[in-house]
Amino acid sequence: MANKHMSLSLFIVLLGLSCSLASGQVLFQGFNWESWKHNGGWYNFLMGKVDDIAAAGVTHVWLPPASQSVAEQGYMPGRLYDLDASKYGNKAQLKSLIGALHGKAVKAIADIVINHRTAERKDGRGIYCIFEGGTPDARLDWGPHMICRDDRPYPDGTGNRPTRTRADFGAAPDIDHLNPRVQKELVEWLNWLRTDDGFDGWRFDFAKGYSADVAKIYVDRSEPSFAVAEIWTSLAYGGDGKPNLNQDPHRQELVNWVNKVGGSGPATTFDFTTKGILNVAVEGELWRLRGTDGKAPGMIGWWPAKAVTFVDNHDTGSTQHMWPFPSDRVMQGYAYILTHPGNPCIFYDHFFDWGLKEEIDRLVSIRTRQGIHSESKLQIMEADADLYLAEIEGKVIVKLGPRYDVGHLIPEGFKVVAHGNDYAVWEKV
C-alpha cells in the first residue's frame, strides 16, 4: 500500500509540472437555485454585477445551464441548441453578458448537463423518448436507441451505460454516451457553445453518471480552456455520524477522474472531500484539517492544481440546503480556501447577499498580492480542536478557530492584514 501511494504521489507531481492551467485562478458561481425567478432575467441582472466580480480578482464565472429545460433551473434540458427558452434570459442577453465578462478579462464557464436529457414528445407507446435538438435539421434529434438499455423507466433503449457502476439519474432518460452519434453531436454542440456563444470552458453536471473515458472525448474534442466536473459522492462516515479521519478512497475517486480525462490538460474536479471535512472541522474539530500524512486531508493534499475548492454552491447551500456549510462560520471557510492551494470558487450568495463582499474581497486581494496559487506550498503549523494555523508559500499565515493566544506561534516579520469571526490572516512584511 505504501509503494502504491508513493507511486501515485510521484505520478501526480510529474503531471502537475506539465499542467497547463493558469496558476492564479479564482472562480465565481454566478447564480443560485432561485436566480431563474429574477424579474427582467438573470443574465441582464448579472450584467450589473460584472464590474464588482472582476474587481474582486475573479478569473472565471460559472453561469447556469443555458438550454431550454423542463425544470426552470436548467438541469432537465431538452432542446440543447435552443438558448432562447431559458428562464435566465435569451441567447442575445447571454452573449451580451459573456461579452461584458470578456471585456473585463473574465472567462465564462457553461454548465453542461449531458448525463440525461428530457424528450420533446412521446412515441407510439406513450413513452417520452423522442428528442428534439432545437434546430431545423436533425442534429440532436434522437430516439429510444440513444437511451441506456438499463434505464428501466424508458424501455427499448439499446445503449449501455459506459460504466455500469456509475450513478443513475431517475428523473430523465440516461443518455448512451458510447453511441458514436451521441458523441459526435454533443461535441459539435460544445464547440458551437464555444465559437458561436463565447463560452470558454465547461462545468460538467452529474459527471459521475458517465465514465471519465467519455468525458475525455468531450474535453479533448471541444478544447475548453478550463473544465471542472461535479463528482459528488458520499464521504465515509463513522457510527457517530461524522466523517472518518481517512477519506483517501473519496479523494482517490476525484484524482482518478482527472487522470483518465487528462492530467496535463484543463480538467479539474470540485474538491468535495475538502468541502465535507471543512464543514465539520469548523464546528470545534479543526484537528481534522491535518491528515494522517501531515498534509491537507482533501484533494488539495494530493493534487491541488486539479482541485476546485468551495464553501457552498446552488445544491449544498442556497435554498436547497442539501449539505450546507455552518452559516455562522462561512468566513472561516473562505479564509481557508482563499489562502490555500487549489482553485477556490466563490458562491454568489455569500458575496452579494450575505454582506461578506468586503471580507472576501480582502482575502482574494491577499491571495493575488502574495502570488498564492493552486500549487502553493502549504505547511500546517497547528491543528487542534480550537486552532488551525498554516503557512502558505512562506508569505501568508492563516488562523481558524476561537483561540487567540497564538502570538508566540507567529514568526517575526508578519503582520495581521485580515480578521473576522474566528479567523485571521497574516502577511509577510
UniProtKB/Swiss-Prot annotation:
One of its GO terms (molecular function) is alpha-amylase activity. Keywords: Calcium, Carbohydrate metabolism, Germination, Glycosidase, Hydrolase, Metal-binding, Signal. It comes from the Eukaryota. Residues 1-24 form the signal peptide. Its EC number is 3.2.1.1. The active site is at D205, E230. Binds 3 Ca(2+) ions per subunit. It is an enzyme of class 3 (hydrolase). It catalyses: Endohydrolysis of (1->4)-alpha-D-glucosidic linkages in polysaccharides containing three or more (1->4)-alpha-linked D-glucose units. It holds the Pfam family Alpha-amyl_C2. Ca(2+) 1 binds at N115, A167, D174, G209. Monomer. Belongs to the glycosyl hydrolase 13 family. This is Alpha-amylase type B isozyme. It comes from Hordeum vulgare (Barley).
